[in-house]
Amino acid sequence: MRHVTGELAASHAAPLFYQSWRPEDEPRAVLILIHGFGEHGGRYNYLVDYLVPRGVAVYALDLYGHGCSPGKRGGLSEWEQYVQDADALVNLVKREEPNLPRFIMGHSMGGLIVASYLLDHQAGLNGAVLSAPLLEEANVSPLIKTAMKLLNRVTPGLSLSTSLDAGAISREPAEVLRYQQDSLNHDKASVRLGNEMLRMAPEVHRRAGKIVLPLLIYHGEGDQLVPISGSRRLADEVGSTDCTFVAYPGGYHELHNDLDRATVLADLYEWLERHL
């Protein structure tokens, strides 16, 4: 396996950190990966170790304010910056792997980013994968939403702790500990980022009929961080005639780091194979 790191010119003045993993032989396809909130592109080692030896190259960036990329942790000016950053990574892959089938995948907040990206950018992609996409907020009261909107007008850059429950990412204690000990992870979100997430999920549902490319959506039924109902709803709303929705019984939020990851990764690879 060949591992490369680099800098990606995107929507910000400072470049973003990205990395790629390629098989020793020529790959048969490439997966473009957008990570979730508070984490980074280097946390997908099980996925990389499964797909790359089977001929699927993986490219991942660290979003602005995340991982090894610059920016205030959890900071964001507007959602379109995430969309532009995803597009920058897609365009990099088009330049570096011009003849390979291309798939884009997003997990959690990254799933929301990819879903919003697909509303206007599907050309040149063979399909998309959404892993536990953040398409419905968990127990956010109307009072909190109103307070967030008011704060967004006054102090959009204010960072707040999300108090993310690391124990909800996986049923494996070792994976929870690994998450907690990873210094590149954080639980900070700016008021603007929180508002943008609350704004974009309904927008994706409203315009979901525009998503017509092959789509795989999967979610754990035991996910305590992102409700599975948003994924079920999107699967019914998209315009694609080739949409697969899979619910994994008991699965926690990070299915690629959970107890049944071997099954999840095998299912992912099989879906990619069918769409080459």
Predicted regions mapped to residue ranges:
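Short alpha-helix in the alpha/beta-hydrolase fold that links the catalytic acid
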Residues: 213, 227-236
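Catalytic nucleophile-loop/oxyanion-hole region of alpha/beta-hydrolase
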Residues: 38-40, 67-97, 264
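Catalytic active-site module of serine/aspartate enzymes centered on a nucleophile-bearing elbow/loop
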Residues: 244-276
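Short beta-strand/loop motif that positions the catalytic acidic residue
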Residues: 211, 217-219, 223
